[in-house]
Amino acid sequence: DSIVYNCWHCEASGGVSLQERQMPNVRRNKVTLAVKHDWDDLNEATLSWLEKRGISEETARETGLKSGKHFISALQKQSDCVVFPYTNQGRMYAAKIRSVEDKGFSCNGSPASFFNIENVVIGEDLYICEGEMDAISLVQCGYENAVSVPNGAVMKVVDGKIDPKEDNKFKFLWDAKNIIDAAKKIIICTDDDGAGQAMGEEIARRIGKDKCWIVEWPDGCKDANDVLVKKGKKEVDKVIY
């Protein structure tokens, strides 16, 4: 028998055997990890990758994207990466990282807030996406109040009463309560799959379904960036409106 695991941040996965075995004595050295803040300005490799995804340099800078070399565990190599910053009062406290050559992911620090939340105009419609690239795609299309959840989607809707003090998976929602309460409408733009739909339902359940609209993506598209790349801005506008 074994237990399988999967990390939604770096996409590491595997299995651990449950068979009892004798473990050798291993000398352990304490290691301290620090969040890296000195990422590079956007380079050609990053800008080229973003352009293929429909994102301009102007939008990339507006949303604070950076470049950097980073070791990607799943690829077992150092790669050119795009860096998605998570900020608090203008200071980056964590970052999600994606290689631009291969589809590899990593994380620096622990994202705990909405991505792009500090660029939101309070009192306007708020667009909640499942991934950073989807939020950036909406910004590219003129929807400046687009944010992304910090964690991966939930697998299923869970019934029962919600206690904000114990709702750790959705703490980012409660931390942004003043912005959410002030928004005219909440447009939920999660992925078009079971997990994305469950995430959208859980978000709406916490905010209040009377204030939420859930986007339905066109056939053949699973998220906002997919629509932008395959069908263009006009189709994004049609879906969002």
Identify the function of each model-found stretch:
Residues P218, K222-Y241:
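Metal-dependent DNA phosphodiester-chemistry modules and their immediately adjacent helices/loops
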Residues S2:
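Flanking scaffold residues of small Cys/His-coordinated metal-binding clusters
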Residues F71-K184, G200:
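Phosphate-handling DNA/RNA-contact segment within nucleic-acid enzymes
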Residues A198-G208:
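Short, aromatic/basic amphipathic alpha-helical patches
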Residues W8:
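Cys/His/Pro-rich metal-binding microdomains
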